């Protein structure tokens, strides 16, 4: 028990002794620190009075100088009294966390590479922040430091720009007790912002805030406007491209219609060639029929001359009379349907020349239209190639090439439509002119032949332009209208010849079979009337009057004696009305003669009341005044004396005209003759 008490007392005494020693040691340290603090304060005050003597008595300025001195001490790592470039760069990177301190470094040093405490204090006094008012400091606190909750505290303390260095150093009394900042992050943030402001001046954000806001707003407006403009231009470009594609499709359709028209022209050309071949065959067939008619007429003539039976001759004469009458009826009908005005041959050549000149002008217009079409196609292909590039759509939308190509397409389309319409109108117009004039105009020997035929100076016509081979048309469109089937070539061959040719050519085979005796003169009258059609209107008028007077006064006998049928037909005029009147008179006389023969079929030749009783109608009659019933040669007729002296001469002239009528019908180069089939081969009994 005693031992334990003693141990406890020894321990308590040791503790008290150790505590006393520690208290004495701390007291001695406090005295030493107080003495050193007093010494540092005295040295700081002396240095401040040396640097800035007018402000060395101001307590606030002393605190600010001490804060600047502490900042300089933080930056001076080697404690040599100067801050060099390396030390400032290290301080900016490590303490202020500047990754690119080039601007701040140049602002801090300037031209002086070593910064002392005096240099740092003078720089601080020259700074704009040193002269800040309380409001400016509060504005800096709100906008730059972003601590608006301490605004009231700053206003109560009336902190100006002079107190900024005290905020830049670590001072627990200032930040904790005076400013009442309990949040450590707020104290650190305020210290860093104040240190940056003291060393490098006021922040740029504070000085140029409005300018930057204005520039930001302007940039946003420009960006939005640019996006909107790009959107509008893109939409306009798409719409324009759609419109251009529609125009291209319309142009392709017009081109296709022109190709279709070209194909139709080719088909019409083939039909035209087929019709020409058929026309040649038909002409050959008609010539064969004419030869057959001539042979039949010769056969009838031989039968009439070889028989001695009057009834047989009368029968053949009646058959011949019926055929002639039928031919006259056909000629009369054709004369009624075609009794119109006949254009002169010179008009045909002039119209053909006019057509060729119009074709030249049409070819020039067509070539221009096709050239515009090629240019528009090339422009469209270029735009398509540009659209495939990276900025092609934007470039096309902002350039004028799209409008130019669109204009070229519309121009080419309009020109192509005009050429197509002009082609159709020209073909229709020349077809109507051919129908009205009755001859071919589109199919002609060519402009050079026409110029030579009309005796025109070639210099008036100019030089014809060659047809280019690189155009769209596969064939020569210069002769489009010539490839169209002429309306005259599609008609019947009988309609292509004039009325004068219809009345003339079918009589090639009637040459010598019309020389009958007085008993056969009634039947041969109608046949001989169609031997010739010559342009002799005065003779035709007299012949028609003689025929009418003879028929009305003394029957058909005086008609035969007074007017020979060959001379009557020879005097047919060109006038359709007068020719029609003559044919009607001849039909009346033929009908009357035929009725008289039917009333007296059994009367012998010597006692016929229609003939002169003093003349014989036998082929063996010895009377020299009796006309030959055979009439097979003009020499035999010229050697005999007839009762009517001029009758034989006119008949001889008719035979001569009949021999050369084939050559006369082919003398006109502009017209082709198609004779009528007026004889039918009678059945042999």
Curated annotation (Swiss-Prot):
Amino-acid positions noted as binding Ca(2+) in the UniProt annotation, renumbered to this chain: 76, 78, 80, 82, 87
Biased composition regions of type Acidic residues, renumbered to the chain: 655-666
Topological category with respect to the lipid bilayer: Single-pass type I membrane protein
Keyword terms: Calcium, Calcium transport, Cell membrane, Coiled coil, Cytoplasm, Cytoskeleton, Endoplasmic reticulum, Glycoprotein, Ion transport, Membrane, Metal-binding, Microtubule, Phosphoprotein, Repeat, Sarcoplasmic reticulum, Signal, Transmembrane, Transmembrane helix, Transport
BP-aspect Gene Ontology terms: activation of store-operated calcium channel activity; detection of calcium ion; enamel mineralization; establishment of localization in cell; intracellular calcium ion homeostasis; ligand-gated ion channel signaling pathway; monoatomic cation transport; myotube differentiation
Localization in the cell: Cell membrane; Endoplasmic reticulum membrane; Sarcoplasmic reticulum; Cytoplasm, Cytoskeleton
Glycosylation sites recorded in the entry for this protein: 131, 171
A GO molecular function held by the record: calcium channel regulator activity
Contributes to fast Ca(2+)-dependent inactivation of CRAC channels as annotated region, ranges: 475-483
Modified residues (Phosphoserine): 257, 512, 519, 521, 523-524, 567, 575, 602, 608, 618, 621, 628, 660, 668
Processing after translation: Glycosylation is required for cell surface expression. Phosphorylated predominantly on Ser residues.
Stretches assigned to the SAM domain: 132-200
GO cellular component: cortical endoplasmic reticulum; endoplasmic reticulum; endoplasmic reticulum membrane; growth cone; microtubule; plasma membrane; plasma membrane raft; sarcoplasmic reticulum membrane
Biased composition (Low complexity): 32-41, 490-499, 608-620
One Pfam family per UniProt: SAM_2
Cytoplasmic side, ranges: 235-685
Assembly with partners or alone: Monomer in the presence of Ca(2+). It oligomerizes in absence of Ca(2+). Forms homooligomers and heterooligomers with STIM2. Interacts with pore-forming subunits of CRAC channels, ORAI1, ORAI2 and ORAI3; this interaction is potentiated upon Ca(2+) store depletion. Interacts (via the transmembrane region and the SOAR/CAD domain) with SPPL3; the interaction promotes the binding of STIM1 to ORAI1. Interacts with ORAI1. Interacts with MAPRE1; probably required for targeting to the growing microtubule plus ends.
Purpose of the protein: Acts as a Ca(2+) sensor that gates two major inward rectifying Ca(2+) channels at the plasma membrane: Ca(2+) release-activated Ca(2+) (CRAC) channels and arachidonate-regulated Ca(2+)-selective (ARC) channels. Plays a role in mediating store-operated Ca(2+) entry (SOCE), a Ca(2+) influx following depletion of intracellular Ca(2+) stores. Upon Ca(2+) depletion, translocates from the endoplasmic reticulum to the plasma membrane where it activates CRAC channel pore-forming subunits ORA1, ORA2 and ORAI3 to generate sustained and oscillatory Ca(2+) entry. Involved in enamel formation.
Name by which UniProt lists this protein: Stromal interaction molecule 1
Organism: Rattus norvegicus
Encoding gene, per UniProt annotation: Stim1
């Amino acid at each position: 028990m005693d031992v334990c008490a003693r141990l406890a007392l020894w321990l308590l005494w040791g503790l008290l002794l150790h505590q006393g020693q520690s208290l004495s040691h701390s007291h001695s340290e406090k005295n030493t620190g107080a003495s050193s603090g007093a010494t540092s304060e005295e040295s700081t005050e002396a240095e401040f009075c040396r640097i800035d003597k007018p402000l060395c008595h101001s307590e606030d300025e002393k605190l600010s100088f001490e804060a600047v001195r502490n900042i300089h001490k933080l930056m001076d790592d080697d404690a040599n009294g100067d801050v060099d470039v390396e030390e400032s760069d290290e301080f900016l990177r490590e303490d202020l966390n500047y990754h690119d301190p080039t601007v701040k470094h140049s602002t801090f040093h300037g031209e002086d590479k070593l910064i002392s405490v005096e240099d740092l204090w003078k720089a601080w006094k020259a700074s704009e922040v040193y002269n800040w008012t309380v409001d400016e400091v509060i504005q800096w606190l709100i906008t730059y430091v972003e601590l608006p909750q301490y605004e009231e505290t700053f206003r109560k303390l009336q902190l100006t720009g002079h107190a900024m260095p005290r905020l830049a150093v670590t001072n627990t009394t200032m930040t904790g007790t005076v400013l009442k900042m309990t949040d450590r992050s707020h104290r650190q943030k305020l210290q860093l912002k104040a240190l940056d402001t003291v060393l490098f001046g006021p922040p740029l954000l504070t000085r140029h805030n409005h300018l930057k806001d204005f520039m930001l707003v302007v940039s946003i407006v420009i960006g939005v406007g640019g996006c909107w403009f790009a959107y509008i231009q893109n939409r306009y470009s798409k719409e324009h491209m759609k419109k251009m594609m529609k125009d291209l499709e319309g142009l392709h359709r017009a081109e296709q219609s022109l190709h279709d028209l070209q194909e139709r022209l080719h088909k019409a050309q083939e039909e035209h060639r087929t019709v020409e071949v058929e026309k040649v065959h038909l002409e050959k067939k008609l010539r064969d029929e004419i030869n057959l008619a001539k042979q039949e007429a010769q056969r009838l003539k031989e039968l009439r001359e070889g028989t001695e039976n009057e009834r047989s001759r009368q029968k053949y004469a009646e058959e011949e009379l019926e055929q002639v009458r039928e031919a006259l009826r056909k000629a009369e009908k054709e004369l009624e349907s075609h009794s119109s005005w006949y254009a002169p041959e010179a008009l045909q050549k002039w119209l053909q020349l006019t057509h060729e000149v119009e074709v030249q002008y049409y070819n020039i217009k067509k070539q221009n239209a096709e050239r515009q079409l090629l240019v528009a196609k090339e422009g469209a292909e270029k735009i398509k190639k540009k659209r495939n590039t990276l900025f092609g759509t934007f470039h096309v939308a902002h350039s004028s090439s799209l409008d130019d190509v669109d204009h070229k397409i519309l121009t080419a389309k309009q020109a192509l439509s005009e050429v197509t319409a002009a082609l159709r109108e020209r073909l229709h117009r020349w077809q109507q002119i051919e129908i009205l004039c009755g001859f071919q105009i589109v199919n002609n020997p060519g402009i050079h032949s026409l110029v030579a035929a009309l005796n025109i100076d070639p210099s008036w016509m100019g030089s014809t332009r060659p047809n280019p081979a690189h155009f769209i048309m596969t064939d020569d469109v210069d002769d489009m209208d010539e490839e169209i089937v002429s309306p005259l070539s599609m008609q019947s061959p009988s309609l292509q010849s004039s009325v004068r040719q219809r009345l003339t050519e079918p009589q090639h085979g009637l040459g010598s079979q019309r020389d009958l005796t007085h008993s056969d003169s009634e039947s041969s009258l109608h046949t001989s009337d169609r031997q010739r059609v010559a342009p002799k209107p005065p003779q035709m008028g007299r012949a028609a009057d003689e025929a009418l007077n003879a028929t009305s006064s003394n029957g058909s006998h005086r008609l035969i004696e007074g007017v020979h049928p060959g001379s009557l037909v020879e005097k047919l005029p060109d006038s359709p009305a007068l020719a029609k009147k003559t044919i009607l008179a001849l039909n009346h006389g033929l009908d009357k003669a035929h009725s008289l023969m039917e009333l007296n079929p059994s009367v012998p030749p010597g006692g016929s009341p229609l003939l002169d009783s003093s003349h014989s109608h036998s082929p063996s009659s010895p009377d020299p005044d009796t006309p030959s019933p055979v009439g097979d040669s003009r020499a035999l007729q010229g050697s005999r004396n007839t009762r009517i002296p001029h009758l034989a001469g006119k008949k001889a002239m008719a035979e001569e005209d009949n021999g050369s009528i084939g050559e006369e019908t082919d003398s006109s180069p502009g017209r082709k003759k198609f004779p009528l089939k007026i004889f039918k081969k009678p059945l042999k009994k």
